[in-house]
């Protein structure tokens, strides 16, 4: 919610978008990141609604490392850490090679086609899923990392993790906001 102070911009609401919008955003995010060769699959977007139809406007996607601070993401921070861990473990275990130079030609080939935006986006997303090994990653996580949520819950519930968060908040927030933010 861009109208809120920095530490309240990432809402705690979930399941507030129609499934079609969620899938559209997934495709856009994967496409942008695959195009640039980034493996941190994030994309900020602004939404406009006209006549009941959503239009999404990706913003700040030239930033391969968006805001990952616990003070910004608060409730969502553990999800981010788990996502990083899953991807890092997958890459290490499968010896995934890092793409050092972008290969944009397949994206440009799609762009040249006489297709609607949605049809092109479907093709971009299919290409992105292949480049980012989405099916292999999901299978790997299902086979080897199903315990990750329990481990993360224990870790983030530990006094050491809570203290680390409190120290970060104390470094950035006024004293009267520290307890409220770290409860």
PLM-predicted stretches and their roles:
Residues 1-12, 26-41, 47-57, 61-71:
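Phosphate-binding core of ATP-grasp and ATP-grasp-like enzymes
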Residues 12-20:
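A contiguous binding-surface segment within folded domains or other stable secondary-structure elements
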Residues 20, 35, 49-183:
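C-terminal active-site "lid" helix and adjoining low-complexity regulatory extension at the edge
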């Amino acid at each position: 919610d861009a109208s809120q102070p920095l530490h309240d911009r990432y809402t705690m609401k979930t399941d507030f978008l129609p499934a079609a919008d969620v899938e559209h955003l997934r495709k856009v995010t994967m496409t942008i990141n695959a195009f640039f060769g980034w493996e941190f699959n994030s994309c900020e977007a602004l939404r406009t609604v006209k006549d009941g139809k959503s239009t999404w406007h990706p913003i700040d996607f030239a930033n391969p490392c968006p805001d990952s601070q616990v003070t910004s993401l608060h409730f969502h921070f553990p999800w981010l850490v788990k996502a990083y861990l899953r991807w890092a473990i997958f890459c290490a275990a499968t010896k995934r090679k890092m793409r050092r130079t972008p290969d944009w030609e397949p994206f440009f080939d799609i762009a040249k086609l006489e297709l609607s935006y949605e049809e092109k986006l479907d093709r971009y997303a299919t290409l992105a899923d292949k480049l980012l090994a989405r099916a292999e990653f999901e299978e790997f996580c299902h086979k080897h990392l199903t315990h990750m949520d329990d481990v993360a819950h224990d870790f983030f519930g530990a006094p050491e993790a809570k203290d680390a968060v409190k120290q970060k908040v104390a470094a950035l927030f006024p004293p009267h906001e520290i307890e409220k933010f770290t409860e």
